A protein has these predicted regions:
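Catalytic alpha/beta core domains of metabolic enzymes, predominantly
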Residues: 87-91, 102-210
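Structural signal for hydrophobic packing residues in well-ordered secondary-structure cores
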Residues: 24-31, 121, 143, 184-191, ...
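Conserved short secondary-structure transition element at the edge of the structured enzyme core
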Residues: 161-164, 201-236
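Flexible, glycine/charged-enriched surface loops at secondary-structure junctions
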Residues: 196, 212-215, 259-262
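A general structural signal for well-ordered alpha-helical segments in protein cores
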Residues: 16, 20, 48, 52, ...
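A non-catalytic, amphipathic alpha-helix used as a structural packing/dimerization or gating element
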Residues: 18, 22, 50, 83, ...
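Active-site beta->alpha loop and helix N-cap motifs at the rims of alpha/beta catalytic domains
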Residues: 1-108
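Flexible C-terminal active-site loop/helix
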Residues: 227-262
């Protein structure tokens, strides 16, 4: 929770902690098979460590998904990322998951960097939100065997799983979880045609709630599913009526139309 889609960057520190506390209270104490992951990441190593420690003292979190720093992008080299994440992992009381989101940050965690960081026992995985399948395959090849390589891009869920990713952390999973699960099951059971067919249905929705209409698009889709989506924070804008109709069409293509609500 509180990764890119959770608008972490739009929350102040008190709001950030309150959201994590509320989610933890709703989930309850460590349900079997569930990993409670909180998004984290400031522009400095020190800031990120302090953030992780503050949350860990207040809430039981199983792992932190830590986005790359990016403001001083020309200076954020791969070596700088290695030092950054190693220091965070040394200080974190719970495991760390790397988060590579180059579309938003302009910073990519290269396969060789992921491999180097996978040597740290407290760094347990990476969420790769790019659609670079060659890079994903190379990462899987280079990291340690028990290192979790996850896709964060719903438009390539089938392809990423087929390439060897062990799962995904997906915005589209908030509104089409059953389809995502069925793609996972189809890939793991060798039903490649079924997985491909399901992906064809999922991709337009995955695009609609991310790159096309952004976080506002996802919130609109949540409302259509009967949840409270709410508004995005300025300067982000709410989707237009035309955009909402497109989102509804994409949503209905993944499930019976009667499940989508106005």
């Amino acid at each position: 929770m509180l990764g890119s889609t959770g608008e972490r960057v739009h929350l102040d520190e008190n709001e950030y902690l309150k959201v994590i506390e509320a989610a933890r209270a709703e989930v309850g104490p460590r349900p079997e098979g569930l990993t409670f992951i909180a998004g984290a990441g400031q522009q400095s190593t020190r800031g990120t460590i302090n953030e992780i420690k503050r949350v860990s003292e207040a809430v039981t979190v199983d792992a932190f998904l830590v986005i790359t720093p990016h403001f001083y992008r020309p200076s954020i080299t791969q070596q700088a990322l290695i030092a950054h994440y190693q220091s965070i992992a040394d200080a974190s009381p719970v495991p760390v998951i790397l988060y590579s989101m180059p579309a938003l940050t302009g910073i990519k965690i290269e396969p060789e960097t992921a491999a180097r960081l996978s040597e740290h026992e407290n760094i347990v995985g990476i969420k790769d939100s790019s659609a670079d399948l060659d890079g994903l395959r190379e990462t899987i090849k280079l990291v340690r065997k028990d290192f979790a390589v996850l896709t964060g891009n719903g438009t390539v869920l089938n392809q990423a799983l087929s390439a060897g990713a062990c799962g995904g952390i997906l915005a589209v999973g908030c509104v089409a979880p059953a389809v995502c699960i069925e793609i996972f099951r189809a890939v793991t059971s060798g039903e490649s045609e079924r997985a491909s067919s399901l992906q064809t249905k999922l991709t337009p929705l995955a695009q609609a709630v991310t790159t096309r209409f952004g976080i506002g698009g996802l919130k609109a889709a949540l409302e259509m599913k009967g949840y409270v989506g709410g508004s995005v924070r300025a300067p982000l804008a709410q989707p237009s009526d035309e955009a909402r109709e497109e989102i509804r069409f994409c949503l209905n293509a993944t499930q019976p139309a009667e499940q989508a609500k106005a």
